[in-house]
C-alpha cells in the first residue's frame, strides 16, 4: 500500500 503524511 501507500503511506501518506498529512
From Swiss-Prot:
Domain of life: Bacteria
More info: On the 2D-gel the determined pI of this unknown protein is: 5.0, its MW is: 75.9 kDa.
Name of protein: Unknown protein CP 6 from 2D-PAGE
Organism: Clostridium pasteurianum
Organism phylogeny: Bacteria, Bacillati, Bacillota, Clostridia, Eubacteriales
Amino acid at each position: 500500500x501507500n503511506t501518506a503524511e498529512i
